[in-house]
Regions:
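Phosphate/anion-contacting hairpin/loop surfaces
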Residues: 2-169
Length: 169
């Protein structure tokens, strides 16, 4: 089991015997991306054998997810690594984007989802729907330190999962 970088994808490498009795490998990939989530089954060369959702070129200009095609993760080369980003790079990448603060976070940093981006804004007492360009330097530095505290919690395993139950009577 492995996770490529901080991507929202998990790969399971499976070994089995083929019809001739020879050992073979297959890869089962779970992409955890909200409404775009998918489960993709590949051979050892990462050729797609099948997937839960087939994605054609008409549905996505980024990549096709179809049997016979090569599997690859969508490119994230313009995104920064949240584990190593400096304060200066954070200000440049996040606070100078022409979109909402929340969107600036998840489109600038690998592995962040819209939900965790909203949580970072909430913890910083900032409205995530405000424009990133509207943040002054002090607010942007505060957002960075709030983000950094959350990342440090994740690195150290300092969190407690919870189940929230709400009765609608």
């Amino acid at each position: 089991i492995r996770q490529p970088g901080l991507e929202r994808a998990i790969e399971f490498e499976l070994e089995h015997l083929n019809e001739m009795g020879d050992p073979c490998r297959k890869i089962l990939i779970l992409e955890l991306m909200g409404k775009h989530s998918n489960i993709i089954f590949c051979d050892e060369d990462r050729n797609i054998l099948d997937s839960i959702k087939h994605v054609s070129s008409h549905m996505s200009s980024v990549r096709e997810v179809l049997p016979g095609r090569k599997y690859f993760l969508p490119q994230t080369q313009e995104k920064s690594d949240p584990l190593t980003i400096s304060e200066e790079e954070f200000i440049e990448k996040v606070c100078k984007k022409p979109c909402s603060i929340s969107k600036a976070l998840y489109t600038s940093l690998t592995g962040l989802s819209p939900l965790i981006s909203e949580e970072i804004c909430y913890r910083a007492s900032i409205d995530g729907s405000d424009a990133a360009l509207s943040l002054n330097e002090t607010a942007c530095i505060h957002l960075y330190h709030t983000f950094k505290r959350l990342i440090d919690q994740v690195k150290e395993g300092d969190f407690t999962p919870n189940i929230i139950y709400r009765c609608l009577l």
